[in-house]
């Protein structure tokens, strides 16, 4: 909650009114999955996409193969989804997958007898998407991110052979749905490349029925005088050409006509194996000016192959090579010849790249699973008894289930959801990746693919992308962008009619946008919608120019349509350098939700939408009045005329709240109500704040008073100095929840037991365990404390027959057990908030084989801000807390207000992120007036407006000071004089009141050193800035070890915090000790502190007993080296001072 429960007054800047609101920010995911399932449509009305298309492609399954046939055909009628057995919440609790059973109605037709058997077959469980656009797989939230790839279709590109420019055509099908085909000129011959095999394209044209005369006419159409090279296939008929083509493509196989037809059909004409897809055919028709519907490159009818776009591609390529500007491609419905412009293609243009969303990726994966299932069906048809066959007996659903599991569990595009805060959650669903199956790889991707393209405008954010190896390959959807049915990204524009801007909004793909002149969103307009200026700055194909208003076709809908949601949350973005804005965008997603959420004093107006669309807060979906509120539920009674929808029982809708739940990243998901009994609520209203939400506005950090000044070197190199007041007031305190689990298994020695009865432990160690040995909720635990008591049987030698006899007579003696309890790991601890016990046989519990029961313990930790934590603002200014000073030692303002945080001024000019300075000045106005501001991206408050507000606030403050009798003292006058000398203000010349007002306009203040009480020599920028604590906390990174695990072979300590490893003393560190001649220290480092087994044991004993540490022996790694040299056949011996061999392996190995 905020410091006050009342909403502060929010004042909005910005001249531009937005004609359409932001679309639903998760619609890319939700709509795609809906289109994939089509669950709300009747079976006979379903479109041929998604799940339906996967079924339609695989069925009917006919086993007529290699001349054998039993006359069975398995055909598909319809599919339906059952009800999911568990809710998403139950699935998270029990480690289950949120899914629904998929049933298909199949019919088996006996062709001979005409008998039809119909059956409903269970095809496995299909994971379902939750309302917020994610999946719950094995209890964990996952997101399937969209993939961007080269759209199928035809592309014309150029390259230089020597000094001659040569053009190439490439025909690309849908991913994994056929071979890429390339056409290029080689010594005057147009060659075709399929599956790495080249042949003259004339050979394939002869197969399509072209004779010598037609070929000559085709190849000399644009250059009648051209000398055609010798054609080795001259005079061949289609069948001969087909056999010749078959020998080129399949050199090993004997050329037979039927085999050749079957091969070529499968390669380029079979819709099941070669598919341009709807986008591919659309792109091909657009490029070549045709209107074909076939999704293959060749057609096959009556035993003959026909053309479906190949000849047009050849003609276009020849026209391009000849340098023509247009080419005639057929005629339209009225018989008028269609002139198509001849241009090269830019493969990075967003008209040539498309997005594969969840639905398409899932359908592809299902197709793979169904293809495997169909193979199994064919085998069973051939091997089994045809009369006894039924659809249920023929179909095995295992391949489908395996394909789904593999996709969600192992695919590069199915990712563990980033739940650090609501923004990171939302951003993850809007991610677009060029990596993944069928995509690019980091190593292969060049600069061009990663670069910002002009068509990214309004579609893909030019700013938000990771730093490092994935830069430009992973990007984010712009705020208003949508993905259309064909997978192309569209941006919205307002239509301009005769120089007047209308409210009619049109969504356009990048290639359509290229045809128009588009004005910017900030072009000044008159009240009637006409442009206010005679010349309008607008762009065509990305080039800005001045146009007359009547020449403008469209106008941007909003200034923020160019950037993503993360970036649109940065106020004064237009004053920040892009590199720092990128860091600011990315770091907002790493902000940890704080205990006291406080929305920014200077926001951009997008904060509310992030909270409502991310799904982390509770949003009302009904109209009514709140009748009951507590920490776990809110009840809303519907108004009489409100529609009864969804989860309404009677006329009451109950909203369950999530309390202290662990997110994927270990942050705390907690919701608390912000409505009271009697409040009226409407659909879309936030009624309970989730993590990092304050009164329905996103609250990732805190509004704190900052100064930008050097501070005794404590803020050197981006280090940050903070006041202890922030820690005391819990401003940056966050709750983190760790999950620990332990399994009790059935072992060869006997079952493990979860119990309180653990040998060798005092009662004090067991005080927080209940009678079952599980820690009580509310207990405070420290590293080493027991969370769950468990005993396992010790391994013992096999008893002799006599012993076994005695045991059977006198009963089993108490067998030895060892303590294998779950303990708190080093560096962890906190308060136990929840324990869950799963036993085999419980409803809905699915334990691994051999596991009898599992106990899970959640421990919450309250983390205050400490030295070593990373903090950052929204403009990419980041640093590590270097010192926490008492508030009385921090610099303070003239009214005694101490500064909360000190940034280094050297971090601003070279990085050119001046947005933070403007935010600080406007934040200072917010602090003085107690209100909050909204300043939209690219439509922000002007510097002049901020100066005026600072002046008004300062005038009030000075008047108050005067009224209270506090005059300017001598020290303040000195600072003002100095400010005059520095040129910050005009020299005061005795008029200090005017100088104070002037200084206020600059946003600077007179600041005093808290330690000495003396004023700081020059004026300092002081104001309120929004600062976030990031997920990189020192507590997770700090690590120390005395003794611990060692590597098996080298016997050296392991590395890394996760392995409880040691610190590596590397080559350069050894050089440092050598340089100092510290021989004994060096020997210690290389022996007893590392891998001298006997030496380190002896040293440990000596330290425990308080004796002097004895010398070292031979390190283990030296023995490994000697053995490796032995394995090379080198006889290596170790000699002592008297040249006598020393057996370094004594006692280690059996004598030969």
UniProtKB/Swiss-Prot annotation:
Catalytic activity: RNA(n) + a ribonucleoside 5'-triphosphate = RNA(n+1) + diphosphate
Pfam families given in the database record: RNA_pol_Rpb2_1, RNA_pol_Rpb2_2, RNA_pol_Rpb2_3, RNA_pol_Rpb2_45, RNA_pol_Rpb2_6, RNA_pol_Rpb2_7
GO molecular function, one term: ribonucleoside binding
CDD domains in alphabetical order: RNA_pol_B_RPB2
Keywords: DNA-directed RNA polymerase, Nucleotidyltransferase, Transcription, Transferase
Any Gene Ontology biological process: DNA-templated transcription
EC number: 2.7.7.6
Signal peptide per UniProt: none
Organism superkingdom: Bacteria
GO (cellular component) term, any one: DNA-directed RNA polymerase complex
Name of the top EC class for this enzyme: transferase
Paired cysteines (S-S): none
PANTHER family listed in its UniProt record: DNA-DIRECTED RNA POLYMERASE I SUBUNIT 2
Main function: DNA-dependent RNA polymerase catalyzes the transcription of DNA into RNA using the four ribonucleoside triphosphates as substrates.
Entry's family note: Belongs to the RNA polymerase beta chain family.
Assembly mode: The RNAP catalytic core consists of 2 alpha, 1 beta, 1 beta' and 1 omega subunit. When a sigma factor is associated with the core the holoenzyme is formed, which can initiate transcription.
Protein name as annotated: DNA-directed RNA polymerase subunit beta
Species this protein is from: Deinococcus geothermalis (strain DSM 11300 / CIP 105573 / AG-3a)
